[in-house]
Amino acid sequence: MYLGFDPFESFYWSMFLFIIGIILSLKISKIIGINYKLSSSLYFWHILLCFVYFFYVLSNGGDAISYFRWAVDNNVNLNFGTAFVINFTAFFVNYLKFSFIDLFVLYNFFGYVGVLFFAASIIQAIKVKKLPYRLFGLLFIFLPSVSFWTSALGKDSLAFMATGMALWGALNYKNRKWLIILSIFLMLLVRPHIAFVLLISFILSLILDKKVSFYTRIFMGSIASIVSIVMLPVIINYVGLEEGSGIDDVSDYVDKRQSYNAGGGSSIDISSMSLPMQMLTYLFRPLPFEAHSIFALLASFDNIILILLVLMGFYFIFKKNKPSIESNRLFLWLYFYLSLIILASTTANLGIAMRQKWMILPFLIFLLLSVIGNNELKIEKIK
């Protein structure tokens, strides 16, 4: 594929970032309680899939190429979402002379940090389980889809880093509020509408928490109102609506989104589906018999594993199995369901869904893994 630039113009930054990444990986792992063997394995696994993604983009094209070209031109106004990624990338391209491959290694590290927080959360959920359940939980940390879609130049690596931080923060939100706030800010930069859901879910979980004092709940409710007033115009502008839009305008926007990304071999017609079917389609398709490429086939195997987890998880939920670890579960469930409704009802392209759903799946995976199996030890509190 003709690119119009040399993706290997330099690779000195790549070598430097690779070494710095290892050092930072070990330091972060120590802080969040992951052993060096696991963190190193994840690091090399993640960067391996980064290079797979890199060469795939060189051969087949992708958003990363457009981000790089726009960053070189450096004439995009400051804004959220795509504009933020372009301006952020432009600094490294135009001032530090990063090449295309250098940027992949940089964004790969952002995604890897998200994987570390995700892994730390999963380990906390499964460490009191019997061996088969622990192995099943570790499988999700090394799912190819997790590292593949979070290893490239683009919004997904930053969004997943924010997701991982929010999940880790929810395990002990009283002492990690700063991490949740940071995750909301990072998500705001790349996906403002999801950041809004993240924020509202967290505040609602505190308001509805009976353990939180009445005055604190009133305070958090006031904060939620103020933040909503400030953020809604930003989100409305970001998604392309106008202030004062009514129900019909929102409905038209959803219809437009359903057809906007309904092109290509991985597109499906979701306009005639019920909302529950849209949600199931978003989470679990493509299935193996629907795969149109090797990457879709690999993703379909991941989806089979996710289906197995959901079946096991809800079986143990109906058995009233207690979670293996304390966490702000209301926050996690609220964020998962609200985000799923928004994303599932506006995404008709399975290729886009395969990437974007990793902003919400870590929450579901943690919630279900924490209840499956028979716990060998008492429920543990995270300090």
Regions found by a protein language model. Name each.
Residues 151-155:
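Short acidic/glycine- and proline-prone juxtamembrane loop motifs at membrane-interface regions
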Residues 35-79, 247-250:
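Extracytoplasmic loop-helix module adjacent to an early transmembrane segment
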Residues 56-70, 76-91, 97-98, 275, ...:
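Extracytoplasmic catalytic/substrate-binding loops of multi-pass membrane glycan-assembly enzymes
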Residues 22-28, 105-127, 308-312:
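Transmembrane-helix motifs of polytopic, lipid-linked glycan transferases
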Residues 188-191, 196-309, 316, 321:
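Alpha-helical transmembrane segments and terminal signal-anchor/GPI-anchor hydrophobic tails
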Residues 35-37, 118-142:
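Transmembrane-helix signature of polytopic, membrane-embedded enzymes
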Residues 172-173, 312-334:
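Membrane-interface helix-loop-helix junctions at transmembrane boundaries of multi-pass membrane enzymes
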